[in-house]
Curated annotation (Swiss-Prot):
InterPro entries: MetalPrtase_cat_dom_sf_prd, YbeY, YbeY_CS. The gene is ybeY. It comes from Bdellovibrio bacteriovorus (strain ATCC 15356 / DSM 50701 / NCIMB 9529 / HD100). One of its GO terms (biological process) is rRNA processing. This is Endoribonuclease YbeY. It is an enzyme of class 3 (hydrolase).
């Protein structure tokens, strides 16, 4: 999967971590048969925004007037898996709340966003939420071990 990073925030995007993490995500989701080989060949765009623009997009597309950690947008381009919009300020705050490093929180939300792009939705039903978070948490545990081993 080719990952394009567009950083429009005042925070540096950890590009090397993102590239390594996303390679591991692809491998793990293919292993779990959640990601098809054809989907793994698509491009993924990551956009990093500061709080105000992230809040504006969240309001426009979800009707929620606050900046959120990650938003996912499907693509009409058959060569693209979609786009994830992330807010580093929210991720940094959440990492402290969750007892994770910033990169771990970013990794968790990248995984979360990719699952949304693959059709998983935790807001539709409790059963779907359990399925999505089950996949996400199990994959995250495996991925953390692989990243710390590198």
């Amino acid at each position: 999967m080719e990952v394009l990073i567009v950083n429009e925030s005042k925070h540096a995007a950890p590009r090397k971590f993102i590239q390594t993490w996303m390679q591991l995500v692809v491998t793990e989701l293919k292993r779990k048969k959640v990601l098809k080989a054809e989907q793994a060949r698509r491009e993924l765009t990551l956009v990093f925004l500061d709080k105000k623009p992230a809040q504006k997009i969240n309001m426009e597309f979800r009707g929620k007037n606050y900046a959120t950690d990650v938003l996912s947008f499907d693509s009409m381009d058959p060569g693209s898996l979609g786009e994830l919009v992330l807010c580093p300020e929210v991720l940094k705050r959440q990492s402290k709340e969750h007892g994770l490093t910033y990169q771990q929180e970013l990794g968790y939300m990248l995984l979360h966003g990719v699952l949304h792009l693959l059709g998983y939705d935790h807001e539709t039903s409790e059963a779907e939420a359990l399925e999505m978070f089950g996949i996400q948490d199990a994959a995250f545990e495996v991925l953390l071990k692989k990243v710390s081993a590198k």
